[in-house]
C-alpha cells in the first residue's frame, strides 16, 4: 500500500494568525481539526510539516531539531510576510517545545503548549517509541513482519533523539525569558 504524504495547510480567516506545530513523528494532520476550529473563530491558521515528517522513518531520522527549528521559523516568517502582525502559537508535544522557543525568540502574542515534554526518562525509551512508530508506519505500507524487522534493525534514531534532548535543555534554561501569556495543557 502506498502512503500519501500529508501537506502543510493554511486556513485563511481573520487578521490574527495562529501557527500550529505538530509533534515528533507527527504531521499537520495532527492539528488540522484545531486549525478548522480556530478558523471558524476568525483566526487564520498555518501548520507546516517539519523535514522528514509525514514520510518514512528512514527519512525522519536524517534530520534534527536544528532542521525542524528552521522549518518553524520559515512558517512564522511566512505569516509575517503575509502581513500578520498578531501571531499566536499552539504546539503539540515537540511542537509545544518549539512554541516556547518562539516565545523568547520572536514577537508573538501568546503560547499554548499541549503535552509538551521538558525532559524524558531515558534515551532508550525515546528510541523504543521511534521504533514503534517505524513498525506501524511500515505495516501501513503493507510490508510483512520479516521485512519490517530487517528494516527496523537498520534504523538509528540516536542523533535525532540527542538533538531533542539538547533542545529541551536549552528551552528549560530560557523559560524565564518568556513574557507573553502562556497556557500549558498537560495530561
Predicted features, each with a name:
Residues 38-57:
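Conserved alpha/beta-hydrolase
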Residues 56-82:
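Catalytic nucleophile-loop/oxyanion-hole region of alpha/beta-hydrolase
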Residues 86-89, 111, 184:
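Conserved alpha/beta-hydrolase fold motif
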Residues 91-95, 99:
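Gly/Ala-rich beta-loop-alpha elbow adjacent to hydrolase catalytic centers
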Residues 112-122:
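Active-site nucleophile loop of the alpha/beta-hydrolase fold
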Residues 157-174, 180:
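Active-site nucleophile elbow and catalytic-triad environment of alpha/beta-hydrolase enzymes
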Residues 177-187:
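Short beta-strand/loop motif that positions the catalytic acidic residue
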Amino acid at each position: 500500500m502506498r502512503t500519501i504524504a500529508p501537506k502543510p495547510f493554511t486556513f485563511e480567516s481573520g487578521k490574527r494568525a495562529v501557527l500550529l506545530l505538530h509533534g515528533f513523528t507527527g504531521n499537520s494532520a495532527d492539528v488540522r481539526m484545531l486549525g478548522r476550529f480556530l478558523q471558524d473563530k476568525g483566526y487564520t491558521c498555518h501548520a507546516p510539516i517539519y523535514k522528514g515528517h509525514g514520510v518514512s522513518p528512514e527519512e525522519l531520522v536524517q534530520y534534527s531539531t536544528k532542521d525542524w527549528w528552521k522549518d518553524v521559523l520559515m512558517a512564522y516568517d511566512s505569516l509575517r510576510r503575509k502581513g500578520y502582525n498578531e501571531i499566536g502559537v499552539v504546539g503539540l508535544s515537540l511542537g509545544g517545545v518549539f512554541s516556547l522557543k518562539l516565545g523568547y525568540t520572536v514577537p508573538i502574542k501568546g503560547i499554548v503548549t499541549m503535552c509538551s515534554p521538558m525532559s524524558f526518562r531515558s534515551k532508550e525509551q525515546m528510541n523504543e517509541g521511534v521504533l514503534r512508530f517505524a513498525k506501524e508506519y511500515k505495516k501501513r505500507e503493507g510490508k510483512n513482519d520479516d521485512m519490517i524487522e530487517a528494516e527496523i534493525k537498520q534504523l538509528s534514531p540516536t542523533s535525532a533523539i540527542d538533538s531533542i534532548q539538547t533542545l529541551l535543555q536549552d528551552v528549560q534554561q530560557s523559560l524565564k525569558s518568556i513574557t507573553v501569556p502562556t497556557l500549558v495543557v498537560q495530561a
